[in-house]
A protein has these predicted regions:
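Short, C-terminally biased terminal segments at protein or domain edges
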Residues: 1-52, 59-121
Length: 121
């Protein structure tokens, strides 16, 4: 089992890497109006996931942490939604990468949801 501080740093890096990976993935989308709108929303939600996790880690109270981690879960879920829309509308040929991003999104949601429920107690 890793120490709390190590876990926090690991998740900061993981959410940031996920944001970078999604941003780079957006370049592979078909060049059309739908992909422009979806990319914009996806980049906003994935970068917000990483940024709000960093903010949660600097929270000054349990209440502030809970508030920020709720935003993280919400934004991570929105990220998954936009990735699913890309999949359903076939806006990319990069299906292996899309599948990997969907799996990572789900893992991040599960981890952050657990942190949220643990901090509520």
């Amino acid at each position: 089992m890793i120490a709390k501080e190590q876990f926090i740093e690991l998740m900061k890096k993981r959410t940031k890497k996920f944001a970078v990976d999604v941003i780079l993935f957006c370049d592979s989308l078909k060049n059309c109006k739908a992909s422009s709108v979806i990319s914009y929303q996806l980049i906003k939600s994935v970068s917000s996931t990483a940024a709000n996790y960093r903010a949660a880690c600097r929270a000054r109270s349990k209440k502030e942490f809970f508030s920020k981690i709720c935003i993280v879960v919400e934004e991570a879920d929105e990220t998954e939604f936009w990735l699913e829309i890309i999949n359903d509308t076939k806006l990319t040929q990069e299906l292996t990468e899309l599948d990997r991003l969907l799996k990572e999104s789900l893992e991040i949601i599960k981890i952050m949801s657990k942190a949220k429920s643990s901090s509520y107690n």
